[in-house]
């Protein structure tokens, strides 16, 4: 599981669906809500979107040694790490 | 030499038992053919072996060491070629290769393989069925798995690529063990050391087209 470039490809593809949904939510409910959705409910949207449009590509990652649960957990943790502090700052100072 | 033993595979979907105490064993240097009518459980067996489909029961041993199905993927012991392409369709072949093999030396092995130069500038989604399957097999061939499961590698390929794929499979025998399923039974019988047919959830060893007729996989003998 040393192939980080492959993982980042998954990260981008997965979050494409998540980001699209979260950005739309941000338009209607505000930036903070959009970010909160990105690290929570948006993960489910990313999962469903990836499963619908790119399901067969999971076999690429399986062959590279990444299980589906590992990929999803890592995406979620990274989203929390990247967006969690931004969300915290928004809640504290805005 | 490495040995893969898969035993006591049971799998049911609802009340229908698909696999009943199926066992397969092979080693690097061998090609095993697996036949069966549509819905007989060929792909199910392969997915259970890979760990992406939960079997009701299953034992996997590699060189005598028991491996949990959940460890098969992370330990890269078994590679899998699915029926549908696993490559991102929007990417160019020349970008897919470095994505999978970050090291330049590994990339060169793919780029300089027979026939790749003819399509390395194309987008994956624009490749012919033969080019795509050949590329996927080349990529799998250079991954570290000692065992490969190939789900219909000859399906929909033009004769030129069937021959190319067969050559590649035979060359892979030196380093890997292969289990392949396909309805192109003559091509499978030609490259396989041993073959099985799945019938009524059980696996039976077959050696010839005649045996396939006996097990009612083929209706008539076309010899």
Per-segment meaning from a language model:
Chain B
Residues 202-223:
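Conserved beta-strand-loop-alpha-helix hinge in the C-terminal portion
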Residues 84, 89-106:
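Q-loop/switch helix immediately C-terminal to the Walker
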Residues 4-6, 19-21:
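Conserved structural motif at the start of ABC-family nucleotide-binding domains
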Residues 35-37:
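The feature captures the beta-strand-to-loop junction immediately N-terminal to the Walker
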């Amino acid at each position: 599981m040393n192939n980080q470039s492959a993982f980042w490809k998954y990260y981008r593809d997965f979050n494409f669906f998540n980001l699209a949904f979260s950005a739309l939510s941000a338009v209607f409910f505000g930036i903070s809500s959009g970010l909160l959705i990105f690290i929570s409910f948006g993960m489910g949207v990313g999962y469903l979107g990836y499963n619908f449009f790119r399901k067969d590509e999971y076999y690429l990652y399986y062959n590279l040694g990444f299980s589906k649960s590992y990929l999803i957990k890592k995406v979620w943790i990274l989203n929390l790490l990247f967006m969690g502090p931004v969300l915290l700052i928004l809640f504290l100072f805005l | 030499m490495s040995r893969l033993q898969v035993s006591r595979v049971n799998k049911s979907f609802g009340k229908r038992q698909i696999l009943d105490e199926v066992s397969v064993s092979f080693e690097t240097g061998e090609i095993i053919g697996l036949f069966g009518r549509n819905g007989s459980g060929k792909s199910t067996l392969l997915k259970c072996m890979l760990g992406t489909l939960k079997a009701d029961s299953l034992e996997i041993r590699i060189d005598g060491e028991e491996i949990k199905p959940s460890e098969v993927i992370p330990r890269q012991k078994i590679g899998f070629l699915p029926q549908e392409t696993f490559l991102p369709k929007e990417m160019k072949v020349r970008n897919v290769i470095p994505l999978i093999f970050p090291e330049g030396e590994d990339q060169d092995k793919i780029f300089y393989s027979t026939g790749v130069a003819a399509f390395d500038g194309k987008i994956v989604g624009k490749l012919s069925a033969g080019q795509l399957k050949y590329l996927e097999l080349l990529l799998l061939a250079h991954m570290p798995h000692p065992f490969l499961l190939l789900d219909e590698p000859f399906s929909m390929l033009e004769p030129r690529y069937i021959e190319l794929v067969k050559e590649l499979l035979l060359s892979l025998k030196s380093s890997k063990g292969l289990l392949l399923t396909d309805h192109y039974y003559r091509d499978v019988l030609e490259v396989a050391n041993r073959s099985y047919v799945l019938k009524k959830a059980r696996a039976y060893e077959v050696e010839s087209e005649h045996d396939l007729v006996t097990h009612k996989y083929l209706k008539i003998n076309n010899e």
